[in-house]
Structure formats: C-alpha cells, structure tokens
Amino acid sequence: MYQKIKGTEDLYGDEMKYWYWIEKKAKDLAIRYGYGEIRTPIFEETKLFIRSVGQDTDIVQKEMYTFEDKGGRSITLRPEGTAPVVRAFVEDGMIAQGFPQKYFYIGPMFRYERPQSGRQRQFHQFGAEIFGSSSAIADAELIIFADRLMKEIGLVDYQIHINSLGDIEDRVKYREALKEYYAQHLENLCDDCKVRYEKNVLRLLDCKVDIEYTKNAPKITDYLGENSRKHYEELKALLDSVGIKYIENPRLVRGLDYYNRTVFEIHHQKLGAMSAIAGGGRYDGLIKEIGGKDVPALGFATGIERLILALKAENVLVDEIETNVVYIAYLGGFDVKAEAIRLSEELRREGIPVGLELMERGLSAQLKNAARVGAKFTIIVGESELERNIVLVKNMETGEQLEFERSFVVSGIKDMITEMQ
C-alpha cells in the first residue's frame, strides 16, 4: 500500500471547515486592506533563496527541498513566500505600476523539518507584501492588518512582539557587541551556536538551548542610529494611536537574513514552546539584492496549520461546511431519475447545496444516507408523485413530511431553510 510522505497531510472531511474559514477571512480582509492576489510557482531557482533568505540560515543549510531537474538546473521547492513575490516584482517589471503596491498570497511551502503538531514538511502560508513605502505608517498598517486577521478568525489569546533591527550600520555595531559578549561563553554554547557565532552571530538570539546567555546579551535597541530609532518610535506611537497592544522584545531577530528595522511576531499563549503563529517585518534591501532597483518593502506571513491549532486551543466555533442541505431520494424508472436530477439542478442554481442519490438503493437506505450526510431536508420522488406532479419533503430533524406541488418546490425549500436559520 502506498503511503503519504512523512511530514505531509491529507486534508478532507470536517477538518476542511477550518481551512475554508481561515482562507475566506484572510482573502476578504486582504481585499479590504487594498491587497491584490499574486500566485507564484511552487519551485524556483535555488540561488534565489540562497541570495534572499541567506546562505548561513537554517532554512538554506538544513531545510530546503533542492533537486537537479532534467536540464541540470538546481531547483528548490519554495520554503517561504516573500522571495518568489519579490522575484516576480523584479522580473515582471511591476515597478512601472507606481507605489505603493500591495499583494497577498496563499499556498503550500516546503521545509525539511522534524514533523510535529502544527509543523509539517509541506505547510501552508497566507502572506502579505507591501512595496514602495519606507514610512513607519506602512509598518504600522501591516501589523494592524495581522492583528485584525487574528481577531477576524476568532483568536483572543495571542501577543504581538515587536523589535527594530536597525540599518546596516546599526547592525555592524551590534554584531561587534554580540561577538564580544558571546566570546566569553563560547566554550559553553551548543554546537549549532558555535557555528552561528562564526557565520552569523545574530542567529544566536534564536537559540532555544542557550537561553540563559541570550537573556543577558546586549540589546539591539541600544545600538540604533538616529533614523532607525525615530522610525521605531513613530511605529510604536502609531500602534498606540489605534489601541494595538504589543510587547517590545529586544531579542526578536527572525530567522531570515533579509530583515531590517521593524520585525514582529505573533505568539499564541496556548501553544507551548512553539508558540509563533505569524511573523514578518521590513526588508528594504531585498529587491536590490536580487537584481531590482532600490525599493523599500515589508511583509508578513502566517502558517495556516498553526492558526488551526490556535483555533482549536481556544475552542473557536467556525462555520460548518454544509454540502448536503437537501438530499434527493427517488424510487422508479428513468422518468423518475430524470425528474430527480432536474430538481437537483434547479435547487443548486438557487445556491442550495444538494446531495443526489447515486447508488439506486431502497428508500429506507436512502433516508439513512441522507441522515448520515447531515441533510436538513429530504425530497422524495416516486412514480406516484411524478404522476400527481408533486414531491414529498421530509424534515430530517422533526420527521415531519409535507407535500409540495412541483412548481412550488424550490420556493418552498428556500422558505423552510430560512425558517431554520
């Protein structure tokens, strides 16, 4: 028997109500905030991610799904969504459309990580990107958008963490301070951190092992230049002006190399150690880094699987998916079948979800199946009903059965559904 690849999931049944709920809320909200959708390929040239995400990041070093195609090209399944959107922005000449430009995306990403609850090797993200603005008001609106998304889907128990990574000059000074600090503890660091110390000392702040050393490390906010500090203070003031609650976290650096100035994460308080459900920030140098013009940009992404865990942790009630509000049962020959299928199409054209008997079972078995699929009403058509130009409608909750003239079936069913809501 064939089995799915480790770290992947088959999604179906009752679980899909969470996916529909999040995807619809996210897309509708993005449009309200002025974003247009963008869809990029799920694989790109490997060098795009090495250049954008960073050669020394865990994603590039350990987690990317990379292969050589039949043309000898190195190809990688996208591990995150920002780099492909930026590549499209540069390659397709989107800069000519003026600024700001705002795009959202939703789709699968791939990372070779240890599978665990809410973290799979194929996972799904909703993300949003803004191109063209260097103003703190863009950072504020992005964080407000992320906060509003959490509220729209029904979450309450989360916290927004923010920080500033400053400009290149600020980070040079900060890296020197970190190097000096961690040099005193180098022999006690975990093996990964010893490598990070040499390649990218900022990554030490991500470590979940050497937490005690991280607590006492220098804070980047103490090394911000005047422009970065002004930008950060304005961001906080703008968030305060609309009542957004946040926590300043000077250890927050994010796991990708392209960030500068604003970074933020959203953590859910009921998900334990792996509590991050969203994150993002500003990446002003990335577009130029991959061959475009010097255009400021920022964005965020949230993992849909992580959001579903959070919804379940809070016992959030989401809309049920009703695929069989009405079930059509029938007994008889071809004319009865034809009437049943005509009736099903009439109801569907009115926007009513309809299940049609496809197995040609006895009436008792059909009614059992109607109950199994959760039908609210079952329409019964037989030879006698066809001759009299009527149908029987059974309320599956109360057991009540009514006769409807054929010409009034659709309007009658619509009225009955309305009364139940």
Swiss-Prot record:
What's one Pfam family here?
HGTP_anticodon
Instruction: State the UniProt keywords alphabetically.
Output: Aminoacyl-tRNA synthetase, ATP-binding, Cytoplasm, Ligase, Nucleotide-binding, Protein biosynthesis
A GO CC term attached to the entry: cytoplasm
Q: Where primarily located?
A: cytoplasm
**Name of the top EC class for this enzyme:** ligase
Give the EC number(s) listed in the UniProt record: 6.1.1.21
State the PROSITE patterns in the record: AA_TRNA_LIGASE_II
Q: Which domain of life is it from?
A: Bacteria
Name its cellular compartments. Cytoplasm
Q: Name one GO biological process term.
A: histidyl-tRNA aminoacylation
Show the InterPro entries listed in the entry: aa-tRNA-synth_II, aa-tRNA-synth_II/BPL/LPL, Anticodon-bd, Anticodon-bd_dom_sf, His-tRNA-ligase, HisRS-like_core, HisRS/HisZ, HisRS_anticodon
**Reaction catalysis annotation:** tRNA(His) + L-histidine + ATP = L-histidyl-tRNA(His) + AMP + diphosphate + H(+)
The UniProt GO MF terms for this protein read: ATP binding; histidine-tRNA ligase activity
Q: Which residues form a coiled coil?
A: none
Oligomer and partners: Homodimer.
Q: Which PANTHER family match?
A: HISTIDINE--TRNA LIGASE, MITOCHONDRIAL-RELATED (PTHR43707:SF1), HISTIDYL-TRNA SYNTHETASE (PTHR43707)
Family under the similarity heading = Belongs to the class-II aminoacyl-tRNA synthetase family.
HAMAP family with a match to the protein in the record: His_tRNA_synth (MF_00127)
The entry's protein name is Histidine--tRNA ligase
Q: Which organism is it from?
A: Fervidobacterium nodosum (strain ATCC 35602 / DSM 5306 / Rt17-B1)
